[in-house]
Amino acid sequence: MVFFPEAMPLVTLSERMVPQVNTSPFAPAQSSSPLPSNSCREYSLPSHPSTHNSSVAYVDSQDNKPPLVSTLHFSLAPSLSPSSAQSHNTALITEPLTSFIGGTSQYPSASFSTSQHPSQVYNDGSTLNSNNTTQQLNNNNGFQPPPQNPGISKSRIAQYHQPSQTYDDTVDSSFYDWYKAGAQHNLAPPQSSHTEASQGYMYSTNTAHDATDIPSSFNFYNTQASTAPNPQEINYQWSHEYRPHTQYQNNLLRAQPNVNCENFPTTVPNYPFQQPSYNPNALVPSYTTLVSQLPPSPCLTVSSGPLSTASSIPSNCSCPSVKSSGPSYHAEQEVNVNSYNGGIPSTSYNDTPQQSVTGSYNSGETMSTYLNQTNTSGRSPNSMEATEQIGTIGTDGSMKRRKRRQPSNRKTSVPRSPGGKSFVCPECSKKFKRSEHLRRHIRSLHTSEKPFVCICGKRFSRRDNLRQHERLHVNASPRLACFFQPSGYYSSGAPGAPVQPQKPIEDLNKIPINQGMDSSQIENTNLMLSSQRPLSQQIVPEIAAYPNSIRPELLSKLPVQTPNQKMPLMNPMHQYQPYPSS
């Protein structure tokens, strides 16, 4: 590209300015015309060069004028909008007049053409009859006004020499600075980093040192015209074919060396595998030999023969007794089985005391037959009926569990009627609807059994009679309420819940007083206790006033009361609640 001095006139035309290629007889018909670079702030087009086919139109060959080029109807989009101060029929020239220089003639020239409607009327009343206006650059005289055209008035031609600030801004660009420096120092034209080496840029050689800034000759290093698309299909909304930066990046990617990964073996090496040899005639140790190596056992015998087999287990084979214990609140139970002919039963144990079951059973039977006969010693009269899991051995040898309700420990059996709806007395054949009524009838009339005893020594066959008797002692002396509280039968929190009875103290005079006390406090307490009578001696006179006095051997089982401890009163809940029936 070549820019000219600042004295270069400004052409202000209406509508749009279309740059063209000068096709003189001394220049090739096609040439490469680079567009301005993006480094100039006046342009918004990319810096990719484009070549356009031009059609020659000879207008005036007598004056040796350069042929005119037909107008290509495309616009250059300026990055700066026109100033509002300019006339409505004046358009800014945002493209330098010398941006498109074609050919390598001895006399370089710059031409431009405009597309103007013939009926356009200017402010001075003149009209533009010709569609093209040409301006020629002479050899040494620089720019001169174009020859007068009949269609353009003198005042209109004078506008070409009027300077404009917009044009000065355009000339003061980096390309103008490059031209001045290139003419003096023979510098190459600046190229964008995205341009290709095959683009037809020119460079100047300063061969004549004259006073002008215009180089005397132009040398092209590539005069071959590049292929350009059809001008009718040019769209300056650039497509991907006209984006040099993407092409440049693609070239860089293609220039990258190929990375070859190391080939790893994809096949698994074959390791030798030896098939195990099988000999059907090989000697296999017989079952007799294997059994003979076992330790001697009375339940196992070996008989010799062609097919040696072990004899079946005898039906009568003594096994050691198994002793198992449950949790802390369960009692131990020992089961001795003399003989078995099936699997080993599975049992669970409840709060019953130690029981001893002896007998034998066959497969298909249960342990309930041998657990019915138990020792009833040590059970409280009002204990709830316990539940026991019994292991049942089926005919197929599998273990089956079922729950059965263990009968309460009663000394008197309660027979049922044949229908099972009533209870019949075995002595008088009297029927009762409830078992406790029948049991009470037998104890009071037939056996005269009195299992309920008071601390005073009196016995009762019914528990409710005992409670009525105890209330007499409590009403006479409230201090005796703690002795008749049924702590062995009920807990203090939930009535009806059985608790374990506490171990009685053997001697009331043995009072522990040395726990958590100093030596001085222990001496004072001993002196105070020595001056007082034992608690058992204080209780006896009060009870002796009643006909049924407490026997001396029962006093040793009374709880202990310290001198500073108050006597607890009977809980009203315990005093008036009904007790469980016998």
Curated annotation (Swiss-Prot):
Coiled coil: none
Stretch list, region Disordered: 24-55, 107-154, 347-366, 375-422
GO biological process, one term: response to starvation
Subcellular location(s) of the protein: Nucleus
Keywords associated with the record: DNA-binding, Metal-binding, Nucleus, Repeat, Transcription, Transcription regulation, Zinc, Zinc-finger
Biased composition (Low complexity): 126-143
One of the Pfam families matching this protein, by short name: zf-C2H2
CC terms in the record's Gene Ontology section: chromatin; nucleus
Entry's induction text: Expression is induced by hydrogen peroxide, and this induction requires prr1 and pap1p as well as atf1p and sty1p.
GO molecular function, one term: cis-regulatory region sequence-specific DNA binding
Zinc finger (C2H2-type): 423-446, 452-473
Amino acid composition bias (Polar residues), ranges on this chain: 107-125, 375-392
Function description: Transcription factor that globally supports gene expression in response to hydrogen peroxide.
Protein name: Hydrogen peroxide stress regulator 1
The organism of origin for this protein: Schizosaccharomyces pombe (strain 972 / ATCC 24843)
Source taxonomy: Eukaryota, Fungi, Dikarya, Ascomycota, Taphrinomycotina
Gene behind this protein: hsr1
